[in-house]
């Protein structure tokens, strides 16, 4: 018994010792001020963070078969379209195409996507939902290349309204064919079209239309091209027929481009005109300066050939004549004719000199003259005067064949040469020979060539401008 009593006392003392070592808590009688929540944290309930059951999903995507179009089996579903053109990136004459960046938007109603909303607000999604629902299969007719932009993410937007109306928008760059007519190039205007059409659904299943008529096409005012002036954008629509599949609604984005002429004036027309004018310089060069006139003619011909080759290299190989071809080839003909003109002048000069030598051999100078030289007269003397100056009696008349256009005489320096002095043909007592260096063809060419080229330019610019 004493043993148990001692054990109980020992345990009691141990408990008292343990309690005495614990820290004592002070009782607070005041009020604790809690921090006030900031207005930044006052958010509405985020429904995306609430896990709901399948029947409670707003769009109920998994409950419907979206492989079929809306109202399948009924009338054609109307799909409105509007386009905002962001830029015209390039126009290629060689490939006969254009590149355009645009925002393409579709509008339709799909009751399978209707949802209840107390605030009647729409919901916006990115491109991931597009793969789960039905969207129109619009494609670009006659397109060569096209892609949807994906920087920094896919440029696709889907907006669904509570009543089931859907807005589907995407940003696209497309390169499409443009049938160009270069018969008036570079004084031409081109009309190109971007065509939109449903790939699978005929007009019995899908009715594609411009949502607001011509107002459905918007363009950026800053759109500009280096070689073209954008004159007009407008929309049209019509039906397209395929013998195997039927009729389809097709929408057209039409735009008209007028080419800037100033670039081609500097690069093509002015150089060609200068080459033609340079070829006329040979008409003022001495006809006996063969190297100068020949080298000038060849240089202008080769330069015109280079200009024509450079222009054709930047153009498609069309089977008809362009306006610039007419101008360049006519200019080339003028340059080439200037070369032929000198060939004719040189030939006639050679023939003339040969006849003069024969004439001198036929009528040798046996008039007892101390000093004599041959003189070529320019035709201002009569036949009798020329013969008298030559020391021949009037009965001896040179024939026209002998004289040709120039009369060659032997002039004696004697006291009876007063008639020749009267004509100013003698200087002192020594005879000399006067050469008429400018041929008659050169004289006429100085007027005919410039007048003809100016007349051609007047007709050309009045027809094509």
From Swiss-Prot:
<dbReference type="InterPro" id="IPR006202">
    <property type="entry name" value="Neur_chan_lig-bd"/>
</dbReference>
<keyword id="KW-0813">Transport</keyword>
<comment type="similarity">
    <text>Belongs to the ligand-gated ion channel (TC 1.A.9) family. Gamma-aminobutyric acid receptor (TC 1.A.9.5) subfamily. GABRR2 sub-subfamily.</text>
</comment>
<dbReference type="Pfam" id="PF02931">
    <property type="entry name" value="Neur_chan_LBD"/>
</dbReference>
<feature type="binding site" description="in chain B">
    <location>
        <position position="197"/>
    </location>
    <ligand>
        <name>4-aminobutanoate</name>
    </ligand>
</feature>
<dbReference type="InterPro" id="IPR006028">
    <property type="entry name" value="GABAA/Glycine_rcpt"/>
</dbReference>
<dbReference type="GO" id="GO:0004890">
    <property type="term" value="F:GABA-A receptor activity"/>
</dbReference>
<feature type="topological domain" description="Extracellular">
    <location>
        <begin position="21"/>
        <end position="260"/>
    </location>
</feature>
<dbReference type="GO" id="GO:0007601">
    <property type="term" value="P:visual perception"/>
</dbReference>
<keyword id="KW-0869">Chloride channel</keyword>
<dbReference type="InterPro" id="IPR006029">
    <property type="entry name" value="Neurotrans-gated_channel_TM"/>
</dbReference>
<feature type="topological domain" description="Cytoplasmic">
    <location>
        <begin position="282"/>
        <end position="293"/>
    </location>
</feature>
<feature type="glycosylation site" description="N-linked (GlcNAc...) asparagine">
    <location>
        <position position="254"/>
    </location>
</feature>
<keyword id="KW-0628">Postsynaptic cell membrane</keyword>
<dbReference type="InterPro" id="IPR036719">
    <property type="entry name" value="Neuro-gated_channel_TM_sf"/>
</dbReference>
<keyword id="KW-0812">Transmembrane</keyword>
<dbReference type="GO" id="GO:0005886">
    <property type="term" value="C:plasma membrane"/>
</dbReference>
<dbReference type="GO" id="GO:1904315">
    <property type="term" value="F:transmitter-gated monoatomic ion channel activity involved in regulation of postsynaptic membrane potential"/>
</dbReference>
<dbReference type="GO" id="GO:0007165">
    <property type="term" value="P:signal transduction"/>
</dbReference>
<comment type="function">
    <text>Rho subunit of the pentameric ligand-gated chloride channels responsible for mediating the effects of gamma-aminobutyric acid (GABA), the major inhibitory neurotransmitter in the brain. Rho-containing GABA-gated chloride channels are a subclass of GABA(A) receptors (GABAARs) entirely composed of rho subunits, where GABA molecules bind at the rho intersubunit interfaces. When activated by GABA, rho-GABAARs selectively allow the flow of chloride anions across the cell membrane down their electrochemical gradient.</text>
</comment>
<dbReference type="GO" id="GO:0007268">
    <property type="term" value="P:chemical synaptic transmission"/>
</dbReference>
<dbReference type="GO" id="GO:0022851">
    <property type="term" value="F:GABA-gated chloride ion channel activity"/>
</dbReference>
<keyword id="KW-0472">Membrane</keyword>
<keyword id="KW-0406">Ion transport</keyword>
<dbReference type="GO" id="GO:0097708">
    <property type="term" value="C:intracellular vesicle"/>
</dbReference>
<dbReference type="InterPro" id="IPR038050">
    <property type="entry name" value="Neuro_actylchol_rec"/>
</dbReference>
<dbReference type="InterPro" id="IPR008057">
    <property type="entry name" value="GABAAa_rho_rcpt"/>
</dbReference>
<keyword id="KW-0868">Chloride</keyword>
<feature type="transmembrane region" description="Helical">
    <location>
        <begin position="326"/>
        <end position="346"/>
    </location>
</feature>
<keyword id="KW-1003">Cell membrane</keyword>
<feature type="transmembrane region" description="Helical">
    <location>
        <begin position="294"/>
        <end position="314"/>
    </location>
</feature>
<feature type="signal peptide">
    <location>
        <begin position="1"/>
        <end position="20"/>
    </location>
</feature>
<feature type="binding site" description="in chain A">
    <location>
        <position position="169"/>
    </location>
    <ligand>
        <name>4-aminobutanoate</name>
    </ligand>
</feature>
<dbReference type="GO" id="GO:0007214">
    <property type="term" value="P:gamma-aminobutyric acid signaling pathway"/>
</dbReference>
<dbReference type="GO" id="GO:0034707">
    <property type="term" value="C:chloride channel complex"/>
</dbReference>
<protein>
    <recommendedName>
        <fullName>Gamma-aminobutyric acid receptor subunit rho-2</fullName>
    </recommendedName>
</protein>
<dbReference type="InterPro" id="IPR036734">
    <property type="entry name" value="Neur_chan_lig-bd_sf"/>
</dbReference>
<comment type="subunit">
    <text>Three rho subunits (rho-1/GBRR1, rho-2/GBRR2 and rho-3/GBRR3) coassemble either to form functional homopentamers or heteropentamers. Rho-2 is unable to form a functional homopentamer. Interacts with SQSTM1.</text>
</comment>
<dbReference type="InterPro" id="IPR006201">
    <property type="entry name" value="Neur_channel"/>
</dbReference>
<dbReference type="InterPro" id="IPR008059">
    <property type="entry name" value="GABAAa_rho2_rcpt"/>
</dbReference>
<feature type="binding site" description="in chain A">
    <location>
        <position position="105"/>
    </location>
    <ligand>
        <name>4-aminobutanoate</name>
    </ligand>
</feature>
<keyword id="KW-0407">Ion channel</keyword>
